[in-house]
């Protein structure tokens, strides 16, 4: 059970391709952890898997997990996002795992706008961050279509077989990616160190749990860069993600360390904090914040926002006036 059963390729924390060795224990741990959340699954329900099964998220949550938990699995190969609404109406799956963009697509699909979707038990988003504005839009859509629960969310990475936290049912704070799963610890540390930070303080999110990979295939040096044994005796995965834990144990994800924008005065700007504000404007469909050169100083960068509008160019002048 502790031998590698699959090698899943990922860019990991450095961006260069590498094979993640996951074990039977890794996938079984994910299934056992999710079984503790009865608000997520109930035996006999139908799960529609729209994620590719050759990635950890798609295989662990969309193939292995439902078979272990006694769910019916409908696998959609090579999903056309434009057909997602039609597929949901055709198969009526109570459960679905996807990325935030899938649910934004579903909420905007005219084919489902006047349909009763009360058959939906839990639709979960992972694999990417979601802004507060987008989360609000999706949850308003679900509530207006008679869905009991808001969109479930989770956080993880290939190196932990896809999932480390979950926000589901009523235990779901806006903006949070949830609480650590059963037998899993998530904490914020001073980046690259084993110094744990206080509640509410931003640092590098690190994960310790039973789904952790054996390592990167034939890359011991890169394995040593991400798997660190701390003084507590636990092996922690250093994710390269910046975030914090609140007083209730909910985890909040800000951005990749590499996305952090440092101004000329050393002030750290987290792109997600700006994106969360901008995304709540009704004219904004999507936005992304990047760092650009500061022409007034020899060092440091300034945040620059790219925006996709909801309705072509009609709001451009309005947004420009609000800069």
Stretch-by-stretch model annotation:
Residues 5-32, 167:
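Conserved AMP-binding A3 loop
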Residues 172-173, 179-183, 195-228, 250, ...:
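Conserved ATP/PPi-binding loop(s) of AMP-dependent carboxylate-activating enzymes
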Residues 89, 96, 209, 214-215, ...:
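AMP-binding/adenylate-forming catalytic core of the ANL superfamily
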Residues 3, 111, 119, 183, ...:
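Glycine-centered tight turns that cap/initiate beta-strands
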Residues 19-21, 49, 71-78, 152:
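Short beta-strand->loop structural element characteristic of the AMP-binding/adenylate-forming
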Residues 28-46, 54-97, 105, 109, ...:
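Conserved AMP-binding/adenylation subdomain of ANL enzymes
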Residues 94-98, 107-174, 185:
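Gly/Ser/Thr-rich phosphate-binding loop
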Residues 1-9, 16, 39-46:
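Conserved pre-ATP/AMP-binding loop-to-beta segment of ANL
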């Amino acid at each position: 059970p502790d031998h590698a059963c699959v090698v899943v390729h990922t860019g990991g924390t450095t961006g260069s391709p590498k094979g993640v060795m996951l074990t039977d224990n890794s996938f079984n741990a994910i299934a056992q952890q999710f079984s503790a959340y009865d608000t997520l699954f109930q035996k006999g329900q139908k799960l529609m898997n729209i994620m590719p099964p050759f990635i950890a998220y798609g295989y662990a949550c969309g193939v292995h997990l439902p078979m272990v938990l006694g769910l019916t699995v409908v696998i959609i190969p090579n999903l056309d996002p434009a057909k997602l609404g039609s597929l949901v109406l055709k198969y009526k799956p109570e459960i679905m795992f996807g990325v935030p963009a899938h649910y934004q697509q579903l909420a905007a699909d005219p084919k489902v706008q006047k349909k009763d979707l009360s058959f939906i038990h839990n639709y979960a988003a992972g694999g990417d961050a979601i802004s507060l504005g987008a989360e609000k839009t999706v949850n308003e859509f679900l509530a207006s279509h008679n869905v009991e629960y808001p969109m479930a969310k989770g956080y993880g990475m290939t190196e932990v077989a896809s999932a480390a936290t979950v926000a589901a049912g009523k235990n779901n704070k806006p903006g949070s990616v949830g609480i650590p799963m059963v037998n899993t610890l998530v904490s914020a540390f001073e980046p690259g160190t084993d110094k744990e930070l206080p509640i509410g303080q931003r640092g590098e999110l690190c994960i310790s749990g039973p789904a952790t990979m054996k390592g990167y295939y034939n890359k011991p040096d890169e394995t040593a860069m991400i798997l660190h044994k701390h003084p507590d005796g636990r092996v922690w995965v250093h994710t390269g993600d910046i975030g914090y834990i609140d007083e209730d144990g909910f985890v909040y994800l800000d951005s990749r360390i590499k996305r952090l924008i440092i101004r000329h005065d050393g002030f750290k700007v987290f792109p997600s904090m700006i994106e969360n504000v901008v995304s709540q404007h009704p004219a904004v469909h999507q936005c992304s914040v990047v760092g650009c050169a500061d022409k007034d100083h020899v060092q440091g960068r300034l945040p620059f926002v790219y925006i996709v509008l909801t309705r072509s160019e009609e709001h451009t002048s309005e947004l420009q006036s609000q800069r």
